[in-house]
């Protein structure tokens, strides 16, 4: 018998969803490509008398009350991930079987803005006064838990965290799940955000 390799197992891309500075969805992405490069906005960094260029997702882009009604206490990182995941599932045209659908989220830094907000609160208010909601949103798997809750998915879920090639690793894992028949389809995504600490590091190390 000829040995079987994972590279022989082909995957199909069925749907795409995205949330970015230019808006939400394929149409917004197509418009952004047609417009070409757009200058970033400048955001101020606390503790530094400087402003740095960043691409910011507008608040109105995240204003989907129907979809986000279950996650009023979620942070921006999780909201962006949920909206993109819901759009990808809708774009695929699949009638999702929640038990046979997997979810893999790739991220380099996770919800690091929320993580540092939590640490700041410990310093400012002490361990006994920190909001448990902020802590629950700071863990790397929080966004995936929101995705599965909002989309009623009960299949295997995982967050892949790597500083480099996180999305490629997530695709490899999805390929394994499909080859092993753990699920019939896998929702694979990548999410990261530029928080205050990241802007500080960017200023100190890259400028």
What feature does the model see in each segment?
Residues 187:
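Short aromatic-hydrophobic micro-motifs that form the base-stacking/packing surface
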Residues 182-184:
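Short, high-confidence coil segments that cap the C-terminus of an alpha-helix
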Residues 173:
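Internal active-site segments that recognize and position negatively charged phosphoryl groups
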Residues 159-165:
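Short beta->alpha junction loops
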Residues 1-156, 168, 176-179, 191-195, ...:
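Conserved "HGTGT" condensation-loop signature of ketosynthase/thiolase-family condensing enzymes
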């Amino acid at each position: 018998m000829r040995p079987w390799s994972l590279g022989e197992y082909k995957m199909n891309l069925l749907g795409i969803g995205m949330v970015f500075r230019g808006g939400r969805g394929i149409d917004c992405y197509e418009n952004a490509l047609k417009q070409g490069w757009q200058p970033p906005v400048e955001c101020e960094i606390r503790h530094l008398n400087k402003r740095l260029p960043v691409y910011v997702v507008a608040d109105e882009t995240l204003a989907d009350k129907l979809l986000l009604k279950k996650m009023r206490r979620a942070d921006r990182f999780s909201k962006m991930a949920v909206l993109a995941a819901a759009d990808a599932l809708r774009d695929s045209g699949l009638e999702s079987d929640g038990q046979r659908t997997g979810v893999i989220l790739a991220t380099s830094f996770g919800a690091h803005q929320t993580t540092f907000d939590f640490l700041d609160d410990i310093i400012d208010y002490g361990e006994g006064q920190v909001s448990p909601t902020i802590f629950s949103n700071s863990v790397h798997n929080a966004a995936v838990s929101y995705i599965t809750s909002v989309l009623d998915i009960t299949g295997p879920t995982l967050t892949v965290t790597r500083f480099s090639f996180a999305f490629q690793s997530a695709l490899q894992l999805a390929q394994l799940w499909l080859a092993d028949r753990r699920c019939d389809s896998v929702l694979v995504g990548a999410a990261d955000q530029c928080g205050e600490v990241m802007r500080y590091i960017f200023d100190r190390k890259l400028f």
